[in-house]
Amino acid sequence: MPKEKDGVIYTINLRRLYWGRRSNRAKRAVRMVREFVARHFGVEPEDVKIDNTVNNYLWSGSITKPPARVQVYVTVKTESGEEGERKVAYVTLANVKDVED
C-alpha cells in the first residue's frame, strides 16, 4: 500500500463489463473503479471519492458503452471526524502532464 499523500497511477481494465448485459454498464463501471481502489488501498468502498472527471469519462459512451479501460490517479489522505480517523481515497482522471509536476 502506498504511503499517505503519495499518488499512484492505475490502469483499470473494464473489459469484463462487456461480458454482462448491456444495460447499466456505466453504472457498473463506476462500481468496479470504486471496488478496485478500495481493495488496493485498504479502505472501505464508501470512503472512495471519485472525481467528476472520472465519472464523466466513464459515462462518455452512454450507459451501454463505457470505455474498456481507464487510467486513474489515486491519493489517500487521513481525515478525522466524529467517528475518529479514517482513510479516504481520492480518484481523479490521470493526465500524465499534470501528475508528473
Curated annotation (Swiss-Prot):
UniProt superkingdom: Archaea
GO molecular function annotation: structural constituent of ribosome
A GO-annotated cellular component: cytosolic large ribosomal subunit
One Gene Ontology biological process: cytoplasmic translation
Keyword Ribonucleoprotein: yes
Record keywords: Ribonucleoprotein, Ribosomal protein
Endpoints of the signal sequence: none
InterPro entries in alphabetical order: Ribosomal_eL31, Ribosomal_eL31_dom_sf
PANTHER family given in the database record: 60S RIBOSOMAL PROTEIN L31
UniProt-listed HAMAP family: Ribosomal_eL31
Family: Belongs to the eukaryotic ribosomal protein eL31 family.
Protein name: Large ribosomal subunit protein eL31
The species this protein was found in: Ignicoccus hospitalis (strain KIN4/I / DSM 18386 / JCM 14125)
